[in-house]
């Protein structure tokens, strides 16, 4: 579920001042980031959360269908698995979990509530430091994200796509169905364009007059080589804000997020 839940207002201070917390912030970047922070906090309420959840659900539903179509055309052997994902928690934040479960139920998301025994039946190597969980048995996880992207890229080229590597200087929408993109070498015209530059996207969206509250988030992970067989599927510990995923490179542990600009 999206991260603008009402309880985030209470969790953030605790995360920031804990040396083992999942959130880090560069304090000298706060003045520049303050407008984004204020808009984010203003949206940490139930009404905004339900609004975001509704439209994220619509996008994610369509994206999975689109991926399924692509996966039928590429070889994802040893790159992708469909073994589901498990979220676990303790009674400490049970109200937040109950709200998330209800929101997903209302949106028609298929989910199965598990007790400790049922979780251990699925993942016997996990220490039972939790009191319950939720299982989404239809979920995919990537064992090699780079390998999957490479396969999709190769399919794109095979279908007649062109890959041009140039630095974009500016872009503007000349009409409803035409975008002008100027690079360091020439100018291009496209009927449809997608801005997918990660943290650098805002420089381009600003040129289109779109006031998008976008800032930078860095994520960090650690790989434990040779331990990927300890679990069969991703497990997310919601109370601590971290997760583990079995991958080809090893068991990946993720959870630390840094907000600090480019």
Task: Describe the role of every protein-language-model region.
Residues 1-42, 170-178, 187-262:
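Active-site substrate-recognition segment that forms the wall
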Residues 1-116:
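Dinucleotide-binding Rossmann-like beta1-alpha1 core, especially the glycine-rich loop
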Residues 86-90, 105, 136-139, 258-261:
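Short beta-strand and adjoining strand-loop segment in the mid-core
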Residues 110-112, 162, 211:
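Conserved beta-strand segments of alpha/beta enzyme cores
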Residues 114-119, 166, 247, 256:
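Conserved beta-strand termini and adjacent loop/short-helix elements that scaffold enzyme active sites
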Residues 121-125, 240-243:
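Short beta-strand/turn micro-motifs at beta-sheet edges
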